[in-house]
Amino acid sequence: MAEWRWIRIFADHLERCGLGAGEVVVVLSESSSRPELVETARLAAEMLGGRVFDLVVPTPVNDQPVAIRSTGASRALQGNPAVLAALATAGLVLDCTVEGLLHAPELRTILRGGARVLMISNEHPESFERFRFSPDLGMRVAQAHRRLARAGCMRVTSAAGTDLTVRLAGAVTAGSTGVTSGAGSIAHWPGGLVLAFPAPGTVEGTVVLAPGDINLTFKRYMERPVTLTIADDHITEIAGDGVDADLFRSYLSAFAQVEGDRSAYACSHVGWGLNEHARWDYLELYDKGAINGTEARAFAGSFLYSTGANEVAGRFTAGHFDLPMRSCTVTLDGREVVEAGQLVVDPDSEIS
């Protein structure tokens, strides 16, 4: 059941996304969506005078050998032309699907119609109480994105042993502020991170997942180190003697057996977090079913390494790991943007 404290927070955010009286708003959900999230979104949009209607689709059967979690690639729309027509002609789509439309194959069709899409992360509404609006977050994300888009090389190191090189030529970059930016735009809430989807053959080195880093598919903090050796974009070795390494190997191998290739082992995207209100330690305070993990992707000073699908590299797979890491140093063309897990204030005031 929705509560007033959540409705007010959602309404404030929808105002930032430009929702005003009379605009057509679709609240998109599926049969497995979180009911209190859907209700809160609907009531907030109605409060602002939106012409609101619900569009509910069935959650499809999972055709994979393992459970799918936290991918950002909802399969709920199933290419249904009537559903796509309704979404594309709306002013604002409030995406309350379980996985979200961010990487869904139908997203481009919806955005081409001019709709704005706000992907509301599948968190318990209580979580949004902590995602306070920072007036400067949009500026800082834009500045960080400009630096990332101009850079030729990203290098990531850590005291734990990470030493990763990503050549950025041909990469597609993006920044998320959490706020839609006009017709045909998408944002996910909470926001506050920048990402690069590398071109093929550009990622190599070593990633060491240290205790306290997070595997968001499992909603689990790493307890023992796991070392990933990466060559030609793909994980070639998973080293570690604890259950974290065993889980990592087991989950990815399931996709390789079904899909017949190693796309699940490949690099999906890399980036860093800028959201000062997001926290890395919040997982301990919620049941796994109450969260999706977007907050962990965005906490300030994090480095995010992700495996799985990458359209830029021509790779498609249902297997996906988002791996937010602490205490990393991230450089772009030799200039630090994150030092040992802390955001670096740029001397030219381009990023803080």
Question: PLM features: residue spans?
Answer:
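Active-site bordering "gate/hinge" segments
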Residues: M1-A231, A256, D261, C328-S352
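Internal helix-turn-beta structural module
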Residues: G289-S352
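Dual-mode signal for accessory low-complexity, basic/Gly-rich regions
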Residues: Y221, E237-T307
